Amino acid sequence: MNTNIFEELSQKKQSLISLTQKAKDYGWITPQKEEEIINRIKNDVLTIGVIGQMKSGKSTFLNAFVFEDDVLPAATTPMTAALSIITYGEKKEIEAEFYTPQEWEEQKMQASRSLEDVKGNEIEESKVKAAKELMEKAHKLGSSLESFLGKNQKDTFENLEEYVGADGKYISITKAVKIYYPKEYLKGVEIVDTPGFNDPIVSREERTKEFLEKADAVLLMLYAGRPFDSTDRSILFENVGKCGIGKVIIGINKYDIAYENGDTIEEINEYVKQQIKDAAKNYGNETLSDLLKETSPIPLSAEMARR
């Protein structure tokens, strides 16, 4: 397996410390947060958030580079996708965190609203659609549903699909799932696979932001076929920036597609770096450009890693 990405992340510890200090100097994070992050880096506890828009290949990447198998499903919709936390364990097992009774009541209220009433309001329409989808999938639990709310549930690794699969029994009430996996390079590492930003499930989006704020590094996955488009720019500058943009690492996924079309790795990297620089200027914040200039995109290919 090609584990260069995690080796490179480990080698970037000193760089992360420097970037964290700069992030504090520019006011992106507090001195207390700076000290917390640096202590965690020095103590070999590395939390990596993996983000990216739909179709950027996050699940395929994690399956190839972490699990070496098709573990995480790629077909789950943004409406029902749970936050996944991957870390080391002596054996393969999972622990699911379910929505609280209060959070579930909020979803029931959203689901009771008419789509016609929110027509034209994209954000509210998304919330209502998500809630209705959750309620529809919740029928699988029947009258036992309420007994799970507010609880954590451990289960065998073989049942992971029941919590993260599109048709899983518990997908409707699962806010996050922790996956324990016996890989040496996961020792002292916590990889957080996020559903994304602008999440229609407010409580889940808050959990995503919470994890990204404590992350030592954030791996932003770009698709080589359309690297750093308007959606990527929004994710980086409007969302990740609030969590401390100095800790961002850019990964260009599926670069082999562009490579086969005649582009070299160097050309792809230079293109992305220039796009980031131009976007930082367009956002009118030179400090962003300064923080990101030390970020060198890492070419990734889940498909090539499996060959």
Specify the residue positions occupied by each region the protein language model found.
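Charged, amphipathic alpha-helical linker segments immediately N-terminal to NTP-binding catalytic cores
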Residues: 1-26
